[in-house]
UniProtKB/Swiss-Prot annotation:
Pfam families (UniProt xref): PE
Xref: InterPro entries: PE-PGRS_N
Keyword Zinc: no
GO cellular component: cell envelope; cell surface; extracellular region
Subcellular location per the Swiss-Prot or TrEMBL entry: Secreted; Cell envelope; Cell surface
Disruption phenotype: PE5-PPE4 double mutant exhibits a severe iron phenotype but secretes EsxG and EsxH normally. Mildly attenuated in vivo.
Keywords assigned: Secreted, Virulence
Similarity section: Belongs to the mycobacterial PE family.
Function text: Important for the siderophore-mediated iron-acquisition function of ESX-3. May play a pivotal role in the evasion of host immune response by M.tuberculosis. Mediates production of IL-10 via activation of the p38 and ERK1/2 mitogen-activated protein kinase (MAPK) signaling pathways.
Domain PE: 3-92
Bilayer-spanning residue ranges: none
Primary site of residence: secreted
Protein name (record): PE family immunomodulator PE5
Length: 102
């Protein structure tokens, strides 16, 4: 079985994941104030309790999504590092054959 890897493709994928990570982080940052501080529609106990419950769920959601965005960012970095590793390995292998340049 042969695995053909294009380091430039991995670098492009890494950049795309980095851009996606930034967009997701921005979207979650703009949504966090709205979902973590739900305003009750009235001052009665049921409205207050429901709004507090929704706010607590919003806080939990914000934490989980932040962790997800962080993990996505780490995955993108890993893809980029893999591409750099393949590129270095290719250069080292080419050097053993006395090939100079590309």
């Amino acid at each position: 079985m042969t695995l053909r890897v294009v380091p430039e493709g991995l670098a492009a994928a890494s950049a795309a994941v980095e851009a996606l990570t930034a967009r997701l982080a921005a979207a979650h940052a703009s949504a966090a104030p709205v979902i973590t501080a739900v305003v009750p529609p009235a001052a009665d106990p049921v409205s207050l309790q429901t709004a507090a419950g929704f706010s607590a769920q919003g806080v939990e959601h914000a934490v989980v999504t932040a962790e997800g965005v962080e993990e996505l960012g780490r995955a993108g970095v890993g893809v980029g590092e893999s591409g750099a590793s393949y590129l270095a390995g290719d250069a080292a292998a080419a050097a053993t054959y006395g090939v100079v340049g590309g």
